[in-house]
Amino acid sequence: MYKYYRLARHLTWYKDEQLDEKEMELGRNLCRNEAPFDLVLSHTCPYPYEPTDLFLAGLDQSTVDSTMERYLGEIEFNLDYKRWAFGHFHADRLYPWADGRQMLMLFNENVVNLDKFMNMTEKQSFKDIIA
């Protein structure tokens, strides 16, 4: 509901809802110095994984700020990780495997068994990792 309230009033987002440049640089440093990562959790997704089929119809996407998605795209491209999970788009989706890595979009209607997610194989589906 909050999203539609904001959109009706032409309010896109508030500055403190996103990382600032200093915080983004901290993330880049973590990627360079602390990899590999077993699991990445983020609110939104890396840009290449944006589910365009879930975008709001009638909303000019050129007016939508994609700073965080582009930043996470940079992180994802440069990061050694096994699994990545995000929400934001209010849907459940298990993306196709890429280089032994798995991307998962979650909504609050399902609970994923973290152990099953971390140990899943390419032959398994979303239903196999539900708690």
Where are these regions (language model features)?
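Alpha-helical hydrophobic/aromatic positions enriched in membrane-embedded helices and signal peptides
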Residues: 35, 79-80
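A structural signal for short, well-ordered beta-strand segments and their strand-loop junctions
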Residues: 39-43, 85-86, 105-106
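Active-site-proximal loop/helix segment associated with metal-binding centers of metalloenzymes
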Residues: 1-66
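Active-site environment of divalent metal-dependent phosphoester hydrolases
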Residues: 3-4, 46-51, 75, 81-96
